[in-house]
């Protein structure tokens, strides 16, 4: 029954324009039900966002797929993720790239995500409790940066941690948010606006 729901979701994603088969395989391989509360387990393979506690959500699979596809990842990419949350997006990335560094401001969520990722034998991930606005400069620069909460503007610290030729994807805005892709060249940042979105805000600081 679960496999049928997975195939239904993958078919929906293809209809929504997600055509990267390596990405679709990763989405099919990562057990989304392991990243949500048991009360919502029956909705695990629906194309919808779900609450994970602490006022945070696990993004809908379409948005996970869309943002990941915009990063243009390769098997050797080094990725910074801001907002580990449940760890679901982290797990998708770990199936696709060489290493993922992920920062989460809420200690309880970071600990739970770390445990889930270890249980799934995903060992190419480093997680850290900290302020996502600051990134993780000690591990940079990065080929790709993905931000899963919306700042009102693009954080300078994250721009500085993007390597030449790198790509950052993030929601930007307060009341009205848009998904943006930033590409770094040798002498400039190129910003593309993709589509309207709705994310929780990227809050400064960290919580115990």
Swiss-Prot record:
GO biological process, one term: protein repair
Record flagged with keyword S-adenosyl-L-methionine: yes
InterPro entries per record: PCMT, SAM-dependent_MTases_sf
Domain of life of the native organism: Bacteria
CDD domains found in the cross-reference section: AdoMet_MTases
Major location category of this protein: cytoplasm
Entry's EC annotation: 2.1.1.77
Signal peptide stretch: none
Gene Ontology, cellular component aspect: cytoplasm
Role according to the record: Catalyzes the methyl esterification of L-isoaspartyl residues in peptides and proteins that result from spontaneous decomposition of normal L-aspartyl and L-asparaginyl residues. It plays a role in the repair and/or degradation of damaged proteins.
Annotated family: Belongs to the methyltransferase superfamily. L-isoaspartyl/D-aspartyl protein methyltransferase family.
UniProt name for this protein: Protein-L-isoaspartate O-methyltransferase
Lineage of source species: Bacteria, Pseudomonadati, Pseudomonadota, Gammaproteobacteria, Enterobacterales
Gene designation per UniProt: pcm
């Amino acid at each position: 029954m679960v496999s049928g729901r997975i195939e239904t979701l993958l078919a929906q994603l293809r209809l929504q324009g997600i055509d990267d088969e390596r990405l679709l395989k990763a989405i099919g391989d990562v057990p989304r039900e392991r990243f949500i509360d048991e009360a919502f387990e029956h909705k695990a393979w629906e194309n919808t966002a779900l609450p994970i506690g602490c006022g945070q959500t696990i993004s809908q699979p379409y948005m996970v797929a869309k943002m990941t596809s915009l990063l243009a990842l390769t098997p050797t990419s080094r990725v910074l993720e801001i907002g580990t949350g449940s760890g679901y997006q982290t797990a998708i990335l770990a199936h696709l790239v060489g290493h993922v560094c992920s920062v989460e401001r809420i200690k309880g969520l970071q600990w739970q995500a770390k445990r889930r990722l270890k249980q799934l034998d995903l060992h190419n991930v480093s997680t850290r409790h900290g302020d996502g606005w600051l990134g993780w400069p000690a591990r940079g620069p990065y080929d790709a940066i993905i931000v899963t909460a919306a700042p009102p503007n693009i954080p300078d610290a994250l721009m500085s941690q993007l390597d030449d030729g790198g790509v950052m994807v993030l929601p930007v805005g307060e009341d009205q948010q848009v998904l943006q892709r930033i590409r770094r060249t040798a002498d400039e940042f190129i910003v593309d606006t993709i589509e309207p979105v709705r994310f929780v805000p990227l809050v400064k600081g960290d919580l115990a």
